Amino acid sequence: MKDRKTKVCFAASSGGHLEELLMMRPLMERYDSFIVTEKTAYETNVDPIKCYYLRQVNRLEIACARKLVMNAFRSLKIFLVERPDLVICTGVLATIPLCLLCKMFGKKLVYIESFAKVKSPTRTGKLLYHFADRFYVQWPEMQECYPNALYVGRIY
């Protein structure tokens, strides 16, 4: 049975972060959900879940700041149209504006640190750790980096 009262935004950059997010498809199907991810040259099938796309951001590019600002405006538009109650994010850079908007609008933010990070935190994780209502790590060792994080196992 689908919970239509709770709207959930699932946000991730492309590649492995999106693959981790898609491992939560049963959760997506349980709620009124939509996905926000980066537009890439390759297509990822997320049907039948609604999907919005942001510009792909690489922190080493000269246009990084410009793309982040553009993504912030795009994220605001998505947020105002969809009005999610909760954002679940697996990172990284392109999704930061959406996560911060979530908190500015008084909504709940859940961040899941990358499966690939076993002993050191991501930059996005270090930032969003201070904003997330729930912060999950996928390795028990990561609780040394994030003392208030929850470890409940791995997505994979």
Residue ranges with predicted function:
Residues 1-42:
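N-terminal subdomain of nucleotide-sugar transferases
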Residues 86-105:
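An aromatic- and histidine-rich active-site surface loop
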Residues 7, 32-35, 50, 107-108, ...:
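Residues at the starts of beta-strands that form the adenosine-phosphate
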Residues 12-14, 32-68, 141, 152-155:
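Conserved nucleotide-sugar phosphate-binding/catalytic loop shared by glycosyltransferases and other
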Residues 107-156:
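Active-site-proximal region of nucleotide-activated glycan assembly enzymes
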Residues 62-85:
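An amphipathic, basic-hydrophobic alpha-helix
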Residues 7, 85-86:
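Structural motif
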